[in-house]
């Protein structure tokens, strides 16, 4: 039962909050070492797509959580491990009695465990949305600390702008010069074990990410990204051969650059224009109705 204080806040608020949980794209991912606790040290160039999940937050007499979207059924039945609920509970514990009950609806448009930060983006969107709904005034540092407790990717998803991420993902540096890219996200909808990908790494002390651009134009960025790597892609391709196939399909349909994001299995192809990206996504979807293809544009560094 709600306390009288919670009831008053619930009755006084009739608004709802909507947050977008943007797909996180690893344009480059270099594994540079491993800590004694087992966590791998990474250098990453990260951006975010216009496409993603969507979360609605509405005051409610009791807590509730509902799902929809193409991939909502995958999460159904596993709500106990859902990062959205973990984020809600963690933020509520930090805020205290002002955190009245809320109904959360998640429209799950991103594939599960696919290397584009869907769960982390959902958790970050929950922190942002409930902070607004509950009228909380947490310092940015405190909110970032809560995000890190939920996972190494959540702090960068909290910002959802182009970043260089180092350490285990918690050391963030904005990249305001990064342009927007027309892109197709592609996934064969086959799971990849992240621990197994890391276990199969041939080398865990690789050269750090270097992005020295004299003229940061789009073509220069493309060249710099092409010269970088995703060190997780070779072992992921060993586990899921479809990753190589889907990358080749993107190239065959005009992608200027292709790469796997995160630990997979999502790959991205960068295209010259959004029209070209949309045409490619439509053709790829017709070729493989059982796979995931999504044309999108990434955010620019000046978001």
UniProtKB/Swiss-Prot annotation:
It catalyses: 4-CDP-2-C-methyl-D-erythritol + ATP = 4-CDP-2-C-methyl-D-erythritol 2-phosphate + ADP + H(+). Its EC number is 2.7.1.148. It is an enzyme of class 2 (transferase). Transmembrane segments: none annotated. Keywords: ATP-binding, Isoprene biosynthesis, Kinase, Nucleotide-binding, Transferase. InterPro entries: GHMP_kinase_C_dom, GHMP_kinase_C_sf, GHMP_kinase_N_dom, IspE, Ribosomal_Su5_D2-typ_SF, Ribsml_uS5_D2-typ_fold_subgr. It comes from the Bacteria. The active site is at residues 24, 153. ATP binds at residues 111-121. Pfam families: GHMP_kinases_C (PF08544), GHMP_kinases_N (PF00288). Catalyzes the phosphorylation of the position 2 hydroxy group of 4-diphosphocytidyl-2C-methyl-D-erythritol. This is 4-diphosphocytidyl-2-C-methyl-D-erythritol kinase. It comes from Rhizobium johnstonii (strain DSM 114642 / LMG 32736 / 3841) (Rhizobium leguminosarum bv. viciae). Pathway: Isoprenoid biosynthesis; isopentenyl diphosphate biosynthesis via DXP pathway; isopentenyl diphosphate from 1-deoxy-D-xylulose 5-phosphate: step 3/6. The keyword Hydrolase does not apply. Belongs to the GHMP kinase family. IspE subfamily. The keyword Kinase applies.
């Amino acid at each position: 039962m709600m306390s009288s204080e919670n009831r008053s806040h619930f009755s006084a608020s009739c608004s709802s909050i909507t947050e977008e949980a943007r797909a996180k794209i690893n344009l480059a991912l270099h594994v540079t070492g491993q800590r004694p606790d087992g966590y791998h040290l990474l250098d990453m160039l990260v951006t975010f797509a216009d496409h993603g999940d969507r979360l609605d937050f509405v005051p409610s007499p009791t807590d509730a959580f509902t799902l929809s979207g193409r991939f909502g059924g995958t999460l159904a039945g596993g709500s106990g491990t859902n990062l959205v609920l973990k984020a809600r509970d963690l933020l509520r514990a930090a805020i205290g009695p002002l955190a009245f009950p809320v109904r959360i609806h998640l429209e799950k448009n991103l594939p599960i465990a696919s290397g584009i930060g869907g769960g982390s983006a959902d958790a970050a969107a929950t922190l942002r949305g409930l902070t607004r709904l509950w009228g909380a005034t947490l310092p940015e540092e405190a909110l970032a600390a809560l995000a890190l407790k939920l996972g190494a990717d959540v702090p960068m998803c909290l910002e959802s702008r182009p970043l260089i991420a180092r350490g285990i993902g918690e050391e963030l540096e904005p990249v305001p010069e990064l342009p927007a890219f027309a892109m197709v996200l592609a996934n064969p909808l086959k799971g990849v074990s992240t621990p197994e990908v890391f276990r199969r790494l041939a080398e865990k002390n690789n050269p750090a990410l270097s992005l020295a651009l004299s003229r940061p134009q789009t073509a220069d960025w493309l060249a710099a990204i092409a010269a970088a790597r995703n060190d997780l892609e070779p072992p992921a391709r060993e586990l899921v051969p479809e990753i190589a196939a889907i990358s080749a399909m993107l190239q065959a349909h005009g992608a200027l650059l292709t790469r796997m994001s995160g630990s997979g299995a999502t790959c991205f192809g960068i295209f010259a224009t959004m029209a070209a990206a949309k045409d490619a996504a439509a053709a790829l979807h017709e070729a493989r109705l059982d796979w995931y293809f999504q044309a999108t544009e990434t955010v620019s560094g000046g978001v």
